[in-house]
Amino acid sequence: MVTYTCDKCNKEFKQKGNYTKHTKRITPCAPEIKNTLIVTVEGTHGANAEVADTINLSTEPIIPTNLKFIDLFCGIGGFHQALVRLNGTCVFACDIDEQCRKTYEKNYNLKPEKDIIDVNIGSIPDFDVLCAGFPCQSFSNSGKKKGFDDKRGKLFESILDIALQKKPSFMFLENVKHIKKIDNGKIFKHILDRINETGYYVTTTELSPHQLGVPQQRERVVFICIRNDLYKKEIDLNFKIPTIPINLDAIFEKDTTKTEKYKISKEEEEILTVWDKMVNKFNIDENLSPTILCNEFQKKYTEEQMKELPSWKQEYITKNKPIYQKYKEFWDSWLIDHKKILTKKEIYGKLEWQAGRKKENDSIFNHFIQLRQSGIRVKKGKYFPTLVAIVQTPIYAKEKRYITPRECARLQSFPDSFILNENDKIAYKQFGNAVNVEVVHFVMSNTLKAYNFIK
């Protein structure tokens, strides 16, 4: 039988194709030094796994002159934006969403493949970094938290299939922070274990744009994965987060001709004005109930009827009683005067006040607002609410308008040169799904610099 032997590491191959692939690998082989490496996987949620892995260790990583990366579940290119800033070149991208592929191609002159499951891994050009914002709908609060029972959750395995064959030096994966808590942490531990089994040391970090000066609270988990033969225990991956002041003004559109079309409707302005009368009635420094169900105030329930209500509703009705009794005369008059609008839509009768204790001259119109299925949510004006793919576009109440797609782009740290989808509804969804550029840029730049992959 003919065998093929590598003249550098003396490894033998029975098939010429495997020998050829070995000689063309990204990280050149070195004289064989067999070691048993015990890799401890540490996630910030305390997941641990030890896996013994016999590998070939090279003394130093080969530093690429031109960092190449692939962008899986690429969306509109949050990872792409970050890695191009690090002088990286994208050699492959894929996303199932047609509109995302169109936006991606328009901005980067690279046409993403459609379905990761149909990709011929062997056809993917060699690369140094794999990045993926793998589907979060299975794991986020906005989704149904189906975890790995859902097909989208299982797409995670497609990432590992590519890593197993192509063996990139680094992987950076992003997901919602709630992924740590699903099924009592079992899903998170499974992810860590599978990454480790694929041949990578992995640690995680939690980061939100507001920690980097971007006025959006959007906590995400970033998985930092380093190929076992490159991992160095002495390199500290707990990066110090710089103190950067929040700059709300940098987000807002200054040209009012560009914001006019985003004004809230007359009906929306009316319901917010009605609720603002209620807010004005509260005393300074008073704590508004987290959720007020005003259409429940005058209802009478027997003990049995109360038990039949959902537990969340029972809780809110109980918490609302003292508020109603304290301002009963006002509430009764207010409910009569505004019954038509308060009962027009179910959400109009619910107020989720998340703006803290009432301040002097406080008003609903001092804050950000979202019209959600759960009610009218009022958030402190310090940060924008988290952008989500589900249509809950934040309202900038001071100007009585929705934030624009361009403002959404800025909240996700995309440059003003980025070409938006022409359909606003699609653009909102795309930015709601996007990876925040500053968050992944911070993690990747610090990791790659620590390993001397970039200057």
Regions found by a protein language model. Give the residues of each.
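Conserved S-adenosyl-L-methionine
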Residues: 113-116, 200-211
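C-terminal recognition-helix end and immediately following basic linker
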Residues: 1-38
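Cys/His-enriched microdomains
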Residues: 4, 67, 385
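Flexible, glycine-/basic-rich loop-and-beta segments that form/coincide
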Residues: 214-291
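C-terminal target-recognition/interaction regions appended to catalytic cores
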Residues: 282-455
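Intrinsically disordered, low-complexity regulatory regions of eukaryotic transcription factors
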Residues: 34-44, 48-51
